[in-house]
Amino acid sequence: MKTDNNYVRSGRERLVDDNYQTIDPRCILALTSLIKITNAVDVCSPNGSGIVDELQEKGIPACGISDAFEEIVSGDWIVTNPPYQRSIVDKIVNRQIERVESGQVKGLAILVRTQFDHAKTRWGMFAANTSYAGQIKMLFRPKWFEDGESTPIHNYVWHIWGEYKIVGYPARIWYWKEH
């Protein structure tokens, strides 16, 4: 019996700290074509990250830091692709949502797998959060490696919090009652 599910496993070794750089320019295009970002910080990568490089290429001032829990960040928007490790990803996202709610930044955009918001434990990030603005579903699978040897196996979405509201699109409702 086969025990390795190809839908879950890519066949590649995991990168240290899940440091998958967002090198596919379509990801940033999907975000910036709908939301005006004046300047940004990527809290999960130092300068030279894929997100920082792509934003700068579009003429948007951007920088990166490697500590998502730093006290102060400099930028109107946080734009990031957090690591996938369950033990840390929710802490990182919740810390960035706190920055939005306190007014330290105008907005937050996180790039995560489409099913990220399906977890009951994340209900507070989305349905119960008035700063949650919506999502941008990308109708392509981002490429994470320059070699072109592998096809991505997961769909991705930008989740948005902050002053920007995505209007003219269907509302998302999270239903979690079991009875």
Task: Tell where the protein language model's regions lie, with residue ranges.
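Class I S-adenosyl-L-methionine-dependent methyltransferase catalytic core
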Residues: 1-179
